[in-house]
């Protein structure tokens, strides 16, 4: 049986990051892999978390998605109207706020330039899927855009850490294709499944490392359950600028210049996690995937290639690609309080981030 393949592009960035660093890297790796949609319309699902600013490190950079659009339109001959960018917002988000979130994250400008549609996945309903062999989620609502066999669904997460899952990669990004939105509150659902509905336990001040890892284990099962219900056609992680910390407004941005891509989502997450500094030995998410027979047991079970200038070359050592320093997660638990000073904190409502749609 052949091994799954994962592809890495590492862009050398000497100066200040520019939009073209994101755009050109995305297009280059797709050209090298020769990704084809086989005539299907394309739907890309980036991580556009709560409309965070385009250069915050929190969202998949819009210029990276713009590079993917260029690949399908300019290299594959798709009409821009057949290439979609989708995300699902909270059920409490008004249409005006939804538009502002797209605008603040840079996607409105990108979509206008590339002439591609932005879609709210929740507006199109779902398909209920009962995949079997699930642990926490058994009847899962999946966006019609992700479930439709006539759509080429591309999962486009950001290379960053997360205060619960530890990493935010392909598996976590798939929460955004869970419809209706009320069913994707997995952090709180995992809390209740792990600790019960004990209203006396609020926040994380009481939480030890073992408690947090138990919570991680529950949400990891949920993410793998969603994977069994919906496997993306292709996965590509934007790590041109990575981010550690708590996934949101406490963290550090790293110019890593990395893109990690492949057809097999679990293998992409194994490799991306390793480049951040996490392995199957120290990441509960991957441990659960291995235990369930979904993830490769060892990174050696994956064929990993570098992509540069259209050339595909087998990688013998991942050391030159691994982040230095490695990514540090901030879990908001007492064990992590001593390292809070490592991270920068900024206000998402600062005046410099306020723009109109």
Stretches found by the model and what they are:
Residues 1-357:
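N-terminal and secondary-structure boundary signal
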């Amino acid at each position: 049986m052949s091994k799954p393949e994962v592809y890495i592009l590492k862009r050398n960035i000497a100066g200040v990051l520019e939009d073209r660093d994101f755009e050109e890297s995305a297009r280059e790796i797709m050209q090298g892999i020769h990704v084809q949609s086989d005539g299907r319309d394309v739907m890309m699902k980036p991580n556009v978390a709560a409309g965070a600013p385009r250069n915050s490190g929190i969202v998949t950079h819009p210029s990276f998605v713009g590079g993917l659009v260029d690949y399908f339109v300019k290299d594959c001959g798709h009409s821009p109207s057949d290439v979609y960018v989708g995300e699902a917002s909270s059920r409490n988000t008004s249409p005006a706020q939804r538009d502002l979130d797209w605008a603040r994250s840079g996607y409105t400008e990108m979509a206008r330039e590339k002439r591609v549609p932005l879609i709210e996945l929740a507006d199109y309903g779902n398909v209920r899927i009962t995949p079997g062999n699930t642990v926490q989620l058994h009847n899962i609502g999946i966006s019609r855009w992700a479930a439709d066999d006539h759509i080429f669904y591309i999962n486009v997460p950001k290379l960053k850490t997360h205060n619960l899952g530890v990493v935010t990669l392909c598996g976590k990004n798939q929460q955004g294709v869970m419809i209706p939105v009320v069913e994707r509150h997995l952090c709180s659902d995992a809390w209740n499944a792990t600790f019960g509905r004990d209203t006396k336990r609020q926040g994380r001040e009481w939480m030890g490392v073992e408690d947090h890892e138990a919570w991680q284990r529950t949400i990891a099962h949920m993410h793998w359950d969603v994977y069994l219900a919906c496997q993306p056609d292709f996965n590509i992680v934007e790590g041109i600028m990575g981010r550690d910390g708590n996934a949101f407004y406490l963290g550090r941005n790293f110019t890593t210049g990395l893109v990690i891509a492949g057809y097999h989502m679990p293998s992409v997450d194994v490799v991306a996690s390793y480049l951040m500094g996490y392995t199957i030995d120290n990441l509960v998410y991957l441990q659960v995937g291995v235990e369930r027979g979904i993830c490769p047991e060892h990174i050696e079970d994956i064929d990993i290639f570098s992509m540069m200038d259209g050339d595909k070359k087998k990688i013998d050592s991942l050391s030159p690609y691994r982040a230095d320093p490695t990514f540090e997660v901030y879990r908001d638990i007492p064990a992590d309080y001593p390292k809070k000073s490592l991270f920068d904190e900024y206000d998402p409502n600062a005046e410099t981030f306020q723009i109109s749609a």
